[in-house]
């Protein structure tokens, strides 16, 4: 079983603003979010299939607790409440499908994968727009 535990720092980000645009976030809020999310602090605690993930930026801090295979409530990256279900896709990759609790919007999901060279790859999607953020342990 992969060990996602640790404090992670971002080294690369692609398409974050484009994903926010696909979610309908206005230009002013996108600029603020992109600046704030340029250096997020990510803390992951893992015990077997149970996870705690805290992501802190200068604008907002999010915390989620979940167990693989059990539905839980969280918020989409743009703050809309949703039900999420995380499953193992492979030995080193978990995928999460999100379902909005109310209203309409793009289909959203995320995945986290540990690479053989120790990087953590976070992929977030909004319909067909894919954002990739790469982290290394601090």
UniProtKB/Swiss-Prot annotation:
Record PTM text: Sumoylated in response to retinoic acid binding, sumoylation is critical for dissociation from ER and subsequent nuclear translocation.
Stated name of the protein: Cellular retinoic acid-binding protein 2
Induction: By retinoic acid.
Placement of covalent cross-link Glycyl lysine isopeptide (Lys-Gly) (interchain with G-Cter in SUMO): 102
UniProt entry keywords in alphabetical sequence: Cytoplasm, Endoplasmic reticulum, Isopeptide bond, Nucleus, Retinol-binding, Transport, Ubl conjugation, Vitamin A
Gene3D superfamilies in the cross-refs: 2.40.128.20
CC terms in the record's Gene Ontology section: cytoplasm; cytosol; endoplasmic reticulum; nucleoplasm; nucleus
